[in-house]
């Protein structure tokens, strides 16, 4: 097992692959199913992992986007994501990593403060999305958003690159780190 690198495999023709990393297996599977139902012009492949590193596999396709899913109700979820981040090559953070925080709808039950996840995403200069994956409509909307983000990261949207999208998303961030 070694660090995951973005360009260690050749891209598949009209194929986009996303890796969802998180400790909530049921929520990840539901999100993956919603993504596969979403309208996509590319062949969509969704892989799930509880943590990184991934076992070495010759058959694994190139991963175009990694989404780290943090459940705000579980400190284990945050710890697993933090430990997994060190197993990524730095080149992945050039527009091919995103964080997804779930469970923010019920603040009273959160064991992780939102600012902790905001600071984590800011540290790695990666976009942070919030969504309550337990609600089907929200999950479907997030699945569509992730599919579109994946198509851009895979290079299937003319005129837009992952790095370009990252700079656009970073420019639209509301709070600065100093305000937190």
Swiss-Prot record:
It is found in: Nucleus; Cytoplasm; Chromosome, Centromere, Kinetochore. Disulfide bonds: none annotated. Keywords: Centromere, Chromosome, Cytoplasm, Kinetochore, Nucleus. Gene3D superfamilies: P-loop containing nucleotide triphosphate hydrolases (3.40.50.300). It comes from the Eukaryota. The keyword Repeat does not apply. Its main location: nucleus. The keyword Nucleus applies. Pfam families: CENP-M (PF11111). Coiled coil: none annotated. One of its GO terms (cellular component) is cytoplasm. Component of the CENPA-NAC (nucleosome-associated) complex, a complex that plays a central role in assembly of kinetochore proteins, mitotic progression and chromosome segregation. The CENPA-NAC complex recruits the CENPA-CAD (nucleosome distal) complex and may be involved in incorporation of newly synthesized CENPA into centromeres. Component of the CENPA-NAC complex, at least composed of CENPA, CENPC, CENPH, CENPM, CENPN, CENPT and CENPU. The CENPA-NAC complex interacts with the CENPA-CAD complex, composed of CENPI, CENPK, CENPL, CENPO, CENPP, CENPQ, CENPR and CENPS. This is Centromere protein M. The lineage of its organism: Eukaryota, Metazoa, Chordata, Craniata, Vertebrata. The gene is CENPM.
């Amino acid at each position: 097992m070694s660090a995951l690198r973005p360009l260690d495999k050749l891209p598949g023709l009209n194929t986009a692959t996303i890796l969802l990393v998180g400790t909530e297996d049921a929520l990840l599977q539901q999100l993956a199913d919603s993504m596969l139902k979403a309208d996509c012009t590319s062949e969509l492949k969704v892989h799930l992992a509880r943590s990184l590193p991934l076992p070495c596999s010759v058959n694994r396709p190139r991963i175009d986007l990694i989404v780290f899913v943090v459940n705000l109700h579980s400190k284990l979820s945050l710890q697993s994501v933090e430990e997994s981040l060190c197993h990524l090559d730095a080149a992945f953070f050039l527009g091919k990593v995103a964080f997804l925080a779930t469970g923010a709808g019920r603040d009273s039950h959160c064991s992780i403060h939102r600012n902790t996840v905001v600071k984590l995403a800011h540290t790695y200069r990666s976009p942070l999305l919030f969504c309550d994956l337990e609600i089907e409509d929200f999950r479907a909307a997030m699945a569509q958003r992730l599919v579109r983000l994946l198509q851009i990261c895979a290079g299937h949207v003319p005129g837009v690159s992952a790095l370009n999208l990252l700079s656009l998303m970073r420019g639209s961030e509301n709070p600065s780190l100093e305000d937190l």
